[in-house]
C-alpha cells in the first residue's frame, strides 16, 4: 500500500513537470519573428513590406479589413454603441464643391469595417471631430470647413445622429452669416468663423462640448472667443473675457497651426487648458500659454501661469502624454527646419524633443512616511502639486531620426501629428511616425521609448526614442503618398495595430484615398488596462422615467477625462501612470476614444484606479481599487456633480495564451485524475485480497 502511494506521488510530480514545460512553451510561443512581412497588392496602393530589426513584435498586412475607402480619415469613435471603434471619414468634390461625410462601422461578424451612412455639406471640410453634441449618448459630427476663398476662414457645422442612425445637419455658421442671423446673446459678438482650428472642451461646466476659437480683429489683430453649445446641436459665440471664468485677461495670439490641448498638468485629475501661442516678446518662437483649473474662494476659475513656456525652435505639433510613466503629463515636441519651396515641409534638422513634467511623484511603498512631502501618497494622487517643464534641454532630451535625408512628413496644408501608443504594453508610450526621404520614398516607423542610462539629473527619468520597427513602401511610380498613420486596436483585444492612410493617382490621374491595416500577430507577456469615460449621460435608472429607452450610450467621445492608476512591479515598487482621453482636436490628431495603459509584466491587480472629469465641481473625481488587468473599464460619471454616485462597468479580455493554458491544465489534471483512479482501484483490490487471505487462516467453530 505504501509502495503504491509512492508511485502515485512520483507520477504526480512527473505530470506536474510536464504541465510546467507545456505552459512555458505556450507562453514563449510566437516570439520568433521573420525578417520581414510582405504586404503585396495594397489594391492600387501597391506593395508594402514591414521590416522589423527587433524581436517581440510582428505585424502582418491584412487586406480584408474593409479599409480600401476613397475618403480622408477624420476621427475615431463608437458610432453605434457596440464598444467597437468606428471610422468617420470625409471627401471633397472640387467640381460640385460639396463634401461628403462617411461612417464606416466595424462589424464583429465580418471582422472588417463596413459602410453605414453618409451626409453632404456644401464647402470643403478641413477637420472633422465626432462627439456627443446634444447629450443623448449618440455620436454626432462637428465639422470645420471653408468656402472657396483662399483665406483662413473656417466655419463650423453640426450633424446630429437621428433615430434612423443617420447624420442630419443641424447648425451651420456659414448659412447664419449669409442670412445675417445672430448667434450671440451679446451685441457685436457674432463670430461666424475662426482663423484657427478650435479646441474642443467643456468650458462652462454643463457637460456639453464647447469650442475655443480665434477671430481676426483689425484693432488688436485677434479676438479669442468661445462657441458655447446650446444643447440642441447649435452654438452661441461669446468673447473670452466676457465668460468670467478666467482670472487673467492678458492673452497671446494662438498659433496657426496649433496643438492646443485640455490636459491635467498639475496632477489634480482635473484637466487644464494649454494653448500654443505667438508671444509678443519673441514672435519667432512658439510658446505654451497654460491655464490651471482651480477653485478660488469657492469659485472655479482658470488661473493663468506666471509665464509662458518657450518651446524648442522650429517646433511642430506637440504631444501630451505620460512618456516616462511617473504619473505626470510630459511633452514630446518634433522639430525641423522647413522650406517655403515645398509648402513649408521639413527639409533638415529633424529631431524629437522629450520635455518631462517635474512634479512630486508617488511614494514607492505604502508604508513610506511622507513627513517632508518628498512623495505623494496613493490616497492623495488627485491632489494639486507644483509642476515645471524642464527648461535646460541637453542632448540627452533629443532623439534623432537615425538616417540622413529622412524627414517628418506633412506641410502647411496638413501638419504632421505623431501617433502615441504603448506597442508592447511595457508601460512606456511609443511613437508612430510618418516619414519621407529626399527620393520620395515613404516610411512609417515605430520609435520605441527607452530610458537614458546612468541619468541622475534632477532625479528625472529622461527618455529617448529609437527606430524599432519600420513599414516601407516601394519605389514604383504609383507609390502612395502617406498623409497620416495611427495606432488602432482593431479587434478590441488590447493590442495596438497600425493603420496607414494615403493617397494615390489612379490611371486617369485622379487623386484617390485608401488605407491599409497592419495587424499585430503575436502577443507579449505584458498586461494592459483600457479605460473609457462617458460624458455624464445617464445609462441605467433614469431611462425608466422616459417613454423610450435609449440603446446608445457609448457615443460620448468625451474630451479631457483624466485617468490615474497605481501598479506594483515585480520588485515591489509602487508607481503611478496618467492618461488623458481625447486631449486634442486641432488638425486631425487621430486620438483613440479611450486610454490604453501598458502594465508591464505584473502578477498584481491595479491597486488604485482614479478618474477625474473636466468639470468645475468640488467633487470631480472618484477612485476604485483592485482592478483586474487585461480589462476594459467604462466609467459612467452620472451625475457629473456627485462623483460618489459614479459607477464602472468592467469586462475582462483574457489573452489567447490564457485559453491554451486552461486547455493544457484541464488535460493534465484529467490524466492525473485517471491515473489516481486506476492506481486507487488497484490498491483497493490488493487490499481486499490481503484481507481475504488473512481471514482464511481462522477456523470458525
From Swiss-Prot:
Q: What are the alphabetically sorted keywords of the record? A: Glycoprotein, Membrane, Signal, Transmembrane, Transmembrane helix
GO CC, sorted alphabetically, is: plasma membrane
Point out the glycosylated residues in this chain: 148, 180, 217, 258, 458, 522, 571
> Where are the Cytoplasmic topological domains?
679-701
Transmembrane feature ranges? 658-678
Superkingdom of origin: Eukaryota
The compartments listed are: Membrane
Q: Signal peptide location in the record? A: 1-29
Topology relative to the lipid bilayer, per the entry, is: Single-pass type I membrane protein
Residue ranges that the UniProt entry lists as topological domain Extracellular: 30-657
* Keyword Transmembrane attached: yes
Gene3D superfamilies cross-referenced by the UniProt entry? Integrin alpha, N-terminal
Q: What is its main location?
A: membrane
Q: Which Pfam families match?
A: C2_ITFG1 (PF23122), FG-GAP_3 (PF13517)
Homology family: Belongs to the TIP family.
**What does it do?**
May protect the parasite against attack by the host immune system by immunomodulation.
Q: What is this protein called?
A: T-cell immunomodulatory protein homolog
Q: What organism is listed for this UniProt entry?
A: Plasmodium yoelii yoelii
Amino acid at each position: 500500500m505504501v509502495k503504491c502511494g509512492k508511485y502515485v506521488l512520483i507520477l504526480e510530480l512527473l505530470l506536474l513537470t510536464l504541465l510546467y514545460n507545456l505552459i512555458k512553451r505556450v507562453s514563449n510561443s510566437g516570439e520568433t519573428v521573420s525578417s520581414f512581412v510582405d504586404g503585396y497588392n495594397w489594391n492600387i496602393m501597391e506593395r508594402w513590406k514591414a521590416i522589423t530589426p527587433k524581436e517581440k513584435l510582428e505585424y502582418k498586412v491584412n487586406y480584408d479589413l474593409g479599409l480600401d475607402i476613397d475618403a480622408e480619415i477624420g476621427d475615431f469613435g463608437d458610432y453605434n454603441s457596440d464598444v467597437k471603434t468606428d471610422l468617420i471619414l470625409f471627401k471633397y468634390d472640387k467640381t460640385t464643391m460639396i463634401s461628403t461625410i462617411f461612417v464606416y462601422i466595424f462589424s464583429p461578424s465580418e471582422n472588417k469595417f463596413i459602410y453605414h451612412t453618409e451626409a453632404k455639406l456644401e464647402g470643403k471640410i478641413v477637420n472633422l471631430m465626432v462627439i456627443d453634441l446634444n447629450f443623448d449618448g449618440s455620436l454626432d459630427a462637428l465639422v470645420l470647413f471653408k468656402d472657396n476663398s483662399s483665406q483662413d476662414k473656417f466655419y463650423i457645422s453640426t450633424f446630429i445622429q437621428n433615430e434612423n442612425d443617420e447624420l442630419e445637419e443641424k447648425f451651420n455658421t456659414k448659412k447664419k452669416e449669409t442670412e445675417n442671423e445672430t448667434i450671440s446673446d451679446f451685441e457685436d459678438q457674432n463670430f461666424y468663423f475662426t482663423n484657427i482650428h478650435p479646441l474642443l472642451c467643456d468650458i462652462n461646466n454643463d457637460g456639453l462640448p464647447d469650442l475655443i476659437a480665434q477671430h481676426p480683429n483689425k484693432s488688436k489683430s485677434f479676438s479669442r472667443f468661445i462657441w458655447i453649445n446650446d444643447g440642441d446641436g447649435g452654438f452661441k459665440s461669446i468673447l473670452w473675457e466676457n465668460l468670467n471664468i478666467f482670472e487673467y485677461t492678458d492673452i497671446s495670439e494662438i498659433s496657426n497651426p496649433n496643438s492646443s490641448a485640455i490636459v491635467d498638468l498639475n496632477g489634480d485629475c482635473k484637466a487644464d487648458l494649454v494653448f500654443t501661442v505667438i508671444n509678443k516678446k519673441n514672435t519667432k518662437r512658439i510658446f505654451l500659454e497654460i491655464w490651471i483649473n482651480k477653485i478660488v474662494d469657492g469659485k472655479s476659475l482658470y488661473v493663468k501661469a506666471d509665464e509662458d513656456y518657450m518651446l524648442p525652435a522650429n517646433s511642430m505639433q506637440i504631444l501630451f502624454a505620460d512618456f516616462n510613466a511617473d504619473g505626470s503629463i510630459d511633452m514630446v515636441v518634433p522639430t525641423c527646419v522647413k522650406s517655403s519651396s515645398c509648402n513649408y515641409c521639413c527639409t533638415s534638422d529633424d529631431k524629437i524633443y522629450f520635455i518631462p513634467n517635474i512634479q512630486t511623484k508617488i511614494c514607492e511603498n505604502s508604508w513610506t512616511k511622507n513627513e517632508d512631502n518628498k512623495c505623494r501618497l496613493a490616497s492623495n494622487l488627485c491632489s494639486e502639486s507644483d509642476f515645471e517643464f524642464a527648461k535646460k534641454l541637453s542632448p540627452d532630451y533629443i532623439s534623432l531620426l537615425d538616417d540622413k535625408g529622412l524627414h517628418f512628413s506633412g506641410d502647411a496644408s496638413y501638419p504632421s501629428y505623431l501617433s502615441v501608443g504603448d506597442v508592447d504594453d511595457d508601460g512606456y508610450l511609443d511613437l508612430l511616425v510618418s516619414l519621407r526621404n529626399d527620393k520620395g520614398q515613404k516610411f512609417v516607423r515605430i520609435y520605441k521609448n527607452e530610458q537614458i542610462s546612468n541619468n541622475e539629473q534632477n532625479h528625472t527619468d529622461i527618455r529617448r526614442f529609437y527606430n524599432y520597427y519600420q513599414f516601407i513602401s516601394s519605389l514604383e511610380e504609383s507609390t502612395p503618398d502617406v498623409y497620416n498613420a495611427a495606432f488602432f486596436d482593431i479587434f478590441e483585444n488590447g493590442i495596438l495595430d497600425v493603420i496607414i492612410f494615403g493617397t494615390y493617382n489612379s490611371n486617369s490621374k485622379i487623386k484617390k484615398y485608401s488605407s491599409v491595416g497592419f495587424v499585430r500577430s503575436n502577443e507579449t507577456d505584458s498586461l494592459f488596462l483600457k479605460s473609457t469615460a462617458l460624458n455624464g449621460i445617464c445609462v441605467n435608472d433614469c431611462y425608466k422615467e422616459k417613454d423610450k429607452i435609449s440603446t446608445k450610450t457609448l457615443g460620448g467621445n468625451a474630451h479631457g477625462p483624466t485617468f490615474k492608476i497605481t501598479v506594483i512591479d515585480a520588485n515591489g515598487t509602487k508607481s503611478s501612470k496618467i492618461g488623458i482621453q481625447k486631449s486634442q482636436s486641432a488638425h486631425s490628431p487621430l486620438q483613440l476614444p479611450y486610454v490604453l495603459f501598458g502594465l508591464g509584466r505584473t502578477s498584481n491587480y491595479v491597486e488604485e484606479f482614479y478618474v477625474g472629469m473636466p468639470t468645475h465641481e468640488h467633487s470631480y473625481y472618484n477612485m476604485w481599487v483592485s482592478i483586474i488587468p487585461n480589462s476594459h473599464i467604462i466609467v459612467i460619471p452620472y451625475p457629473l456633480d456627485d462623483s460618489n454616485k459614479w459607477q464602472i462597468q468592467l469586462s475582462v479580455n483574457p489573452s489567447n495564451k490564457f485559453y491554451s493554458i486552461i486547455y493544457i491544465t484541464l488535460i493534465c489534471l484529467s490524466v492525473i485524475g485517471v491515473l489516481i483512479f486506476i492506481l486507487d482501484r488497484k490498491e483497493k483490490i490488493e487490499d481486499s485480497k490481503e484481507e481475504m487471505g488473512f481471514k482464511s487462516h481462522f477456523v470458525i467453530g
